[in-house]
């Protein structure tokens, strides 16, 4: 798709403060799904080379944004979008004072979703996921990470990953899949966590890698999940098969999972409410992103805040994601998460936008192809009818998305 965008106030997110401030009316040329040229100068006032690249004769479609805001497409770098079942009853239990850990010990929580997901077909899982995905797309999302983890058998984990990848055929969006077989201990392995981890490493990871069903492997490293030794075994196996690693770490306690994730050069360590300074230092010495999940923090009514000031002090990149899931974050709006990150965690609007663009791209391994508006990068963009990028964090509920561009293809969300 060849597309020329004119009169866009560009928020590139490329270079610090400058990349956050909207440019004067700019032009962006898109060819073969990539950004071919950018100019913030009036027509005829840029270099001859840039003017030639942006000549309308090279493009089959032109869109005049008339001063509307153009940002990178938003990236949701942590979701559990594929699942069956309903856990609204647990919401009431928590409101009555039953803690999440106790619900899980009673066989609720993740395992109730496991039962429903195992009973669903791949086609049913796709249909159930589409409304959730549509909510994300309506908030400007162009890339979504989707985890497995509600199957916990080889057959059902593969089913979930195939359903996730199939979403690309249903909607104009990029899907990245992550194996999260080490999400919870399935009933068949009750009391035998080491045996289950052996099963994950010997039976599930090799098939997932062979069939190219995931690019990363994640582990729920927590007191009600898997310990450090078990997590490390999964990480080591994933690396052996050429897969990236990610961690659900320090959500409910400090086990050192974040430091382990950083040691294995993980793409991201997610949740991190109980992360201490040693863990932050470990992140700062790696390329591992700290992913904040304010939806789960809010929904669980947690009080332990992630160490935002330490993350700033040590210059650790912070991503933000929805954590869409049936038990602890049933939210499908990434701009709502931006607002929560600002109001609950005290991020700035600039940090929030960078957290769902540049840093979210890094958390998925796309540092050099997504998350900023830059020549040579993927043409994944969002068009907004707003005055300033801070409005994305400030306003909640107002319909502000005009359209999305994915791989250079324009999709209207009420504009043009």
Curated annotation (Swiss-Prot):
Gene3D superfamilies registered for this protein in UniProt: Metal-dependent hydrolases, Urease, subunit C, domain 1
Keywords assigned by UniProt, alphabetized = Cytoplasm, Histidine metabolism, Hydrolase, Iron, Metal-binding, Zinc
Q: What CDD domains does UniProt report for this protein, alphabetically?
A: Imidazolone-5PH
Principal localisation: cytoplasm
One GO cellular component, as annotated: cytoplasm
Which pathway does the protein contribute to?
A: Amino-acid degradation; L-histidine degradation into L-glutamate; N-formimidoyl-L-glutamate from L-histidine: step 3/3
User: For binding Fe(3+), which residues are annotated in this chain's numbering?
Assistant: 78, 80, 248, 323
What is the required cofactor set for this protein?
Answer: Zn(2+); Fe(3+)
| Pfam families xrefs | Amidohydro_1
Q: Which domain of life is it from?
A: Bacteria
Q: Where in the cell is it found?
A: Cytoplasm
Q: Where does Zn(2+) bind?
A: 78, 80, 248, 323
| GO MF term (any one) | iron ion binding
- Could you tell me what reaction this enzyme catalyses? 4-imidazolone-5-propanoate + H2O = N-formimidoyl-L-glutamate
> What's a BP term from Gene Ontology annotated to this protein?
L-histidine catabolic process to glutamate and formamide
* HAMAP family, per the entry: HutI (MF_00372)
Q: In which family does this protein belong, per the annotation? A: Belongs to the metallo-dependent hydrolases superfamily. HutI family.
Described purpose of this protein according to its UniProt entry: Catalyzes the hydrolytic cleavage of the carbon-nitrogen bond in imidazolone-5-propanoate to yield N-formimidoyl-L-glutamate. It is the third step in the universal histidine degradation pathway.
Which PANTHER family has this protein been placed in? IMIDAZOLONEPROPIONASE, IMIDAZOLONEPROPIONASE-RELATED
Instruction: Note the NCBIfam families from the entry.
Output: hutI
**Protein name, entry field:** Imidazolonepropionase
The record lists the lineage as: Bacteria, Pseudomonadati, Pseudomonadota, Gammaproteobacteria, Vibrionales
**Gene of origin?**
hutI
């Amino acid at each position: 798709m060849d597309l020329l965008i004119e009169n866009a106030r560009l928020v590139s997110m490329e270079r610090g403060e400058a990349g956050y401030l909207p440019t004067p009316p700019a032009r962006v040329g898109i060819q073969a799904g990539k950004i071919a040229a950018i100019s913030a100068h009036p027509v005829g006032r840029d270099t001859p080379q840039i003017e030639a690249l942006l000549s309308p004769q090279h493009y089959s479609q032109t869109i005049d944004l008339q001063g509307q805001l153009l940002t990178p497409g938003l990236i949701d770098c942590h979701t559990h979008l594929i699942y069956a079942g309903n856990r609204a009853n647990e919401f009431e239990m928590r409101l009555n004072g039953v803690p999440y850990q106790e619900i899980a010990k009673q066989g609720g929580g993740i395992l109730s979703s496991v039962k429903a997901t195992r009973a669903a077909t791949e086609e049913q899982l796709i249909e159930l996921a589409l409304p959730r995905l549509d909510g994300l797309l309506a908030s400007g999302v162009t890339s979504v990470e989707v985890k497995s983890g509600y199957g916990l058998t080889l057959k059902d984990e593969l089913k979930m990953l195939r359903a996730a990848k199939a979403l690309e055929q249903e909607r104009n969006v990029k899907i990245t899949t992550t194996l999260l077989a080490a999400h919870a201990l399935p009933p068949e392995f009750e009391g035998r966590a080491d045996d289950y981890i052996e099963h994950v490493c010997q039976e599930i990871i090799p098939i997932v890698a062979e069939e190219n069903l995931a690019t990363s492997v994640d582990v729920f490293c927590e007191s009600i999940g898997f310990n450090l030794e078990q997590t490390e075994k999964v990480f080591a196996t994933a690396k052996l098969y050429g897969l990236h690693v990610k961690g659900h770490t320090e959500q409910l306690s400090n086990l050192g999972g974040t430091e382990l994730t950083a040691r294995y050069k993980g793409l991201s360590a997610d949740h991190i409410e109980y992360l201490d300074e040693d863990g932050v230092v470990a992140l700062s010495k790696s390329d591992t992103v700290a992913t904040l999940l304010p939806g789960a923090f809010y929904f669980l009514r947690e009080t332990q805040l992630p160490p935002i000031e330490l993350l700033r002090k040590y210059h650790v990149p912070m991503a933000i994601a929805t954590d869409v899931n049936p038990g602890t974050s049933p939210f499908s709006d990434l701009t709502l998460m931006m607002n929560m990150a600002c109001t609950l965690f005290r991020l700035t609007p600039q940090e929030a936008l960078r957290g769902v663009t540049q840093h979210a791209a890094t958390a998925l391994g796309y540092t050099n192809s997504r998350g900023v508006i830059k020549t040579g990068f993927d043409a994944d963009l969002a068009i907004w009818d707003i005055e300033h990028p801070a409005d994305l964090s400030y306003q909640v509920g107002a319909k502000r998305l005009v359209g999305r561009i994915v791989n250079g293809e324009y999709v209207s969300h009420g504009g043009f």
